[in-house]
């Protein structure tokens, strides 16, 4: 019996102790909630935290004072200095690149071309390694590179043999002037770029050789205003005469001459004898604008590339890509160039529409491509971020130059 009473007393004691503990915990929780609520009242809102680390009206950071209109006290907070995380440098084209960047195979090719000198180059101008500011180089290009087309008054195109074949309308009345233009390379790094819509938003778009838009619209767009083709394609591509790819926009054909040859000299010895194919095309498509670039222009451009380059460059004409860039700088206020300077998608795949691998497509073998890219990087007025993410370089055209 005594044992049972002790058991009951002990149970009551435990219950009282638990009840007391619960009351204490509840009271402490209430006090904590009150303190938390009070802290929330004076906590800085996130929107004001953002203001505190950037520019803000001066009143926010001055001592507390009364708003004379509202009679409400304005709380002030101390300025918070944001710690800026250092940005890693973006790996983009170095405008001071030299042949030391080439692999042994491309170095050997470069030396072979120097020895061959197929086009009898004998450069006697200034340089190498002449330095120009961006604006001075633009002026130099504008004044010394004449972008013009063969006309029916040029001998021997003024003979009966050529009567009716060349376009009657002057190139400059047919093309431009435009405000914002795009030059779209054929580089493999354009694949999966998703740049199509951006490219098509330009006033005019220049493409090269047989680079298609069908099946690649998302990456390269659909618009073609000018297509620059080389004489090798015109003479060897069987589909050239009938493929609809070559009936959209304005066609410009170029063929390299011997160094600084005039039109009659070049006509006697073209690099590729495209003349009969050109006539056949004009008979099939008489309304299609199809111009022939004067052969002096590529060598005028080559002279300037050699002048500013620290090394001897290949004695071969500039690439179609570089010629197209200069053509559009003549016609447009602003030229956006896509994947001439490689982006983060850089690849040894030469073309976005073919599976052909060769590092020469980026670094150059036949053409002085490495130094062409140096020139474009020097002229670039866009950001390294644009180059890295989109492969986009932005150049000003010649029309707005203050020379």
From Swiss-Prot:
Disulfide-linked positions: 139-403, 181-332, 350-361
Impact upon substituting residue 350 to A/S: Loss of enzyme activity
EC number(s) reported in the record: 2.4.3.1
GO MF assignments: beta-galactoside alpha-2,6-sialyltransferase activity; protein homodimerization activity; sialyltransferase activity
Segments on the Lumenal side according to the record's topology features: 27-403
Glycosylation: residue positions: 146, 158
Compartment list: Golgi apparatus, Golgi stack membrane; Secreted
GO cellular component, one term: Golgi cisterna membrane
Stretches assigned to the Cytoplasmic side: 1-9
Pathway(s) this gene product operates in, as recorded in its UniProt entry: Protein modification; protein glycosylation
Modified residues (Phosphotyrosine): 366
Record field: transmembrane: 10-26
The record's account of how the chain is modified after translation: N-glycosylated.
Binding site for substrate: 186, 209, 230, 319-321, 350-351, 362, 366-367, 373
Reactions catalysed according to its record: a beta-D-galactoside + CMP-N-acetyl-beta-neuraminate = an N-acetyl-alpha-neuraminyl-(2->6)-beta-D-galactosyl derivative + CMP + H(+)
Main location: Golgi
Assembly mode: Monomer and homodimer.
Record function comment: Transfers sialic acid from CMP-sialic acid to galactose-containing acceptor substrates.
Cited PANTHER family: BETA-GALACTOSIDE ALPHA-2,6-SIALYLTRANSFERASE (PTHR46059), BETA-GALACTOSIDE ALPHA-2,6-SIALYLTRANSFERASE 1 (PTHR46059:SF2)
Protein name stated in the entry: Beta-galactoside alpha-2,6-sialyltransferase 1
Source species of the chain: Mus musculus (Mouse)
Taxonomic lineage: Eukaryota, Metazoa, Chordata, Craniata, Vertebrata
């Amino acid at each position: 019996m005594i044992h049972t009473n002790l058991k009951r007393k002990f149970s009551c004691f435990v219950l009282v102790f638990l009840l007391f503990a619960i009351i204490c915990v509840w009271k402490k929780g209430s006090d904590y909630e009150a303190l938390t609520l009070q802290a929330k009242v004076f906590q800085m809102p996130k929107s004001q935290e953002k203001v505190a680390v950037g520019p803000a009206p001066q009143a926010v950071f001055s001592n507390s004072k009364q708003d004379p209109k509202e009679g409400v006290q304005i709380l002030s907070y101390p300025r918070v200095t944001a710690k800026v995380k250092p940005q890693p440098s973006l790996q983009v084209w170095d405008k001071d690149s030299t042949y030391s960047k080439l692999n042994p195979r491309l170095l050997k090719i470069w030396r072979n071309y120097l020895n061959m000198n197929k086009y009898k180059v004998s450069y006697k101008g200034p340089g190498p390694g002449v330095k120009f500011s961006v604006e001075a180089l633009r002026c130099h290009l504008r004044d010394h590179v004449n972008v013009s087309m063969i006309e029916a008054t040029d001998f021997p195109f003024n003979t009966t043999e050529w009567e009716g074949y060349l376009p009657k309308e002057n190139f400059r009345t047919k093309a431009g002037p435009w405000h914002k233009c795009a030059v779209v390379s054929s580089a493999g790094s354009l694949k999966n770029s998703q740049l199509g819509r951006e490219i098509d938003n330009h006033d005019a778009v220049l493409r090269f050789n047989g680079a298609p838009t069908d099946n690649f619209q998302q990456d390269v767009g659909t618009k073609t205003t000018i297509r620059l083709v080389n004489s090798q394609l015109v003479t060897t591509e069987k589909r050239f005469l009938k493929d609809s790819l070559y009936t959209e926009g304005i066609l410009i054909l170029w063929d390299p001459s011997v160094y600084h040859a005039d039109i009659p000299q070049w006509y006697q010895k073209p690099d590729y004898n495209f003349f009969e194919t050109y006539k056949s095309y004009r008979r099939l498509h008489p309304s299609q604008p199809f111009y022939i670039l004067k052969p002096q222009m590529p060598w005028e451009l080559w002279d300037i590339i050699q002048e500013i380059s620290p090394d001897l460059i290949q004695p071969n004409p500039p690439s179609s890509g570089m010629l197209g860039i200069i053509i559009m700088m003549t016609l447009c206020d602003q030229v956006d160039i896509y994947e001439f300077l490689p982006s983060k998608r850089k690849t040894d795949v030469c073309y976005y529409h073919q599976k052909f691998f060769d590092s020469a497509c980026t670094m150059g073998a036949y053409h002085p491509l490495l130094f062409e890219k140096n020139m474009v990087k020097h002229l670039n007025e866009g950001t390294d971020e644009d180059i890295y993410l989109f492969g986009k370089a932005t150049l000003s055209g010649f029309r707005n130059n203050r020379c």
